Amino acid sequence: MFPLLIVLSQLPRLTLAVPHCIRSLKDSEHAPEEVFASKEAANIFMHRRLLNNRFDLELFTPGDLERECYEEFCSYEEAREILGDDENTIKFWQTYSIKGPTTGSDVNKEKIDVMSLLTGLIVAGVFLVIFGLVGYYVCLTKCKRRPYPSSSANYTRTARYTPSIVFRSPEEAVLSPSTSSEDAGLPSYEQAVALTRKHSVSPPPPYPGPARGFRVFKKSMSLPSH
């Protein structure tokens, strides 16, 4: 009596489980017949957005199962286009419709987005190059504005050790005559002293009135007689 009660209690669960199994078998059997999609589904497929492969050039690189069906959801038409064979497509779709895009190996494996990593590295390199060029330009402008210390030191040395006027006594000038003045065409010390004496002696001022002891003769201009 007790086993009969147990069987009767399990009848609702059996009635709920059997239609689900029958429906899944019917879907798997009629999957190859659903090759042609409707107009709305085709438009949705043509205007679909890229998910994980948005950085890849999908128009130029051929698609594969890992990128089209494991990284994102794919349809039966996409799988058939990649595999190119009806038998392989049916086998793949039977397992793919049950497991879905994620597999056991993909769950344990950490995926690295290579394209995002490369994009970040390229952007960082471009910014480093731009900052380097800006720093080089700033250094050039600062160096142009700042005077060179070597040129200022040379100027102070020449100004300090080569005076424009050299004072000498007459004895030193006689004992050690300079050749630089002769080469430059400048007068010697004796010539300079003679010139200064000649120009410094001024003539006496003239006295007013006629000079004493001298007669002043006036010359008259007359026309000759005919």
UniProtKB/Swiss-Prot annotation:
In this UniProt entry, the residues modified to Phosphoserine are 164
Q: Where is this motif: PPXY motif?
A: 204-207
Segments carrying motif LPXY motif: 186-189
Q: Does Amino-acid biosynthesis count among this protein's keywords? A: no
Spell out the GO cellular component terms annotated for this protein, sorted alphabetically and separated by semicolons.
Answer: endoplasmic reticulum-Golgi intermediate compartment membrane; extracellular region; plasma membrane
Cytoplasmic side stretches: 135-226
Q: How is it modified after translation?
A: Gamma-carboxyglutamate residues are formed by vitamin K dependent carboxylation. These residues are essential for the binding of calcium.
How does it sit in the bilayer?
Single-pass type I membrane protein
Q: Which residues lie on this side of the membrane: Extracellular?
A: 50-113
- Assembly and interactions? Interacts (via cytoplasmic domain) with WW domain-containing proteins MAGI1, MAGI3, NEDD4, NEDD4L, WWTR1/TAZ and YAP1.
Q: Which family does it belong to?
A: Belongs to the commissureless family.
Q: What is this protein called?
A: Transmembrane gamma-carboxyglutamic acid protein 4
Q: Tell me what organism the protein belongs to.
A: Mus musculus (Mouse)
Upper classification of the source organism reads: Eukaryota, Metazoa, Chordata, Craniata, Vertebrata
